[in-house]
């Protein structure tokens, strides 16, 4: 009827605990890096806007 998983070696072996943790750490590090860049752009962008407004006024 439906397809069943075979044990003929066609499935990927499960990752080790170390590999899973390493992958999760890399993903979290990337997220924090992106978040930090966004925050830096927001903070620095506000300072630039204020300087530009002072020049125009």
From Swiss-Prot:
It is a single-pass membrane protein. It is found in: Cell membrane. The chain crosses the membrane at residues 29-45. One of its GO terms (biological process) is negative regulation of cell population proliferation. Coiled coil: none annotated. Residues 16-47 are annotated as: Required for DVL/RTFL small polypeptide activity. Glycans are attached at residue 5. GO terms for cellular component: plasma membrane. The keyword Glycoprotein applies. Pfam families: DVL (PF08137). Keywords: Cell membrane, Developmental protein, Glycoprotein, Membrane, Transmembrane, Transmembrane helix. InterPro entries: DVL, DVL_RTFL_regulatory. Belongs to the DVL/RTFL small polypeptides family. Small polypeptide acting as a regulatory molecule which coordinates cellular responses required for differentiation, growth and development, probably by restricting polar cell proliferation in lateral organs and coordinating socket cell recruitment and differentiation at trichome sites. This is Small polypeptide DEVIL 20. It comes from Arabidopsis thaliana (Mouse-ear cress). The gene is DVL20.
């Amino acid at each position: 009827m439906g397809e069943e998983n075979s044990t003929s070696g066609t499935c990927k072996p499960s990752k080790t605990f170390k590999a899973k943790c390493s992958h999760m750490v890399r993903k979290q590090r990337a997220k924090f890096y992106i978040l930090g860049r966004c925050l830096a752009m927001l903070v620095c962008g506000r300072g630039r806007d204020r300087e530009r407004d002072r020049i125009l006024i």
